[in-house]
Amino acid sequence: MSEFIVGARGHDFGRRSVEELLSSIGDAGFRCTQLAYTKAVESVKSYADVTPELVAATNAAVQKSGVSIAVDGTYVELSYADEDKRRTEVAKALSQVPVAKALRAGCMGSETTNMAKQPTVSRREAQEALLRSLGEILPVCEEQGVLFAVECVYYHAMNTPEAVKMVLDTIASPNLRVICDLANYV
């Protein structure tokens, strides 16, 4: 039987250096984490701040703490219907594929855009934008051997189990996964 490994969201431990963050997570008894650099690492304000040096420091902290990176939390707005905004968000996600690979992360993870951020856009339009985004991201992930997971949230573009199934069936990529936090359905 497979071993059950318990992890924690890094950003629940506050914004710190990667060394302090992973040490604190390990000291709390966890063996893996969702590391969202822009939410958890004090020196990171944008994905441009995730440098090769920071990735190397993260890998060193992983080795020292014994806390692995289960999810490289790459929070971007994948469902913007505005094409310029959507492409900007896709570029952010694509910039992090080599990071996830270097971290040996279990997967990259993102939510799918709060519908309140684009009140004149229908959920169907937002889901179509999500499909376009994933259609651009997944081929790169497949090429690099990186898994990409989307998280269903009630008030986001991908908001129900049926919407999740539609996305999985439409994209049909072996590298597409789903993060399931049941609290997000209420």
Go through the PLM ranges and name each one:
Residues 100-121, 144-153:
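Active-site groove signature of glycoside hydrolases
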Residues 12-14, 37-39, 75-78, 112-117, ...:
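Active-site-proximal loop/turn and secondary-structure-junction residues that shape catalytic pockets
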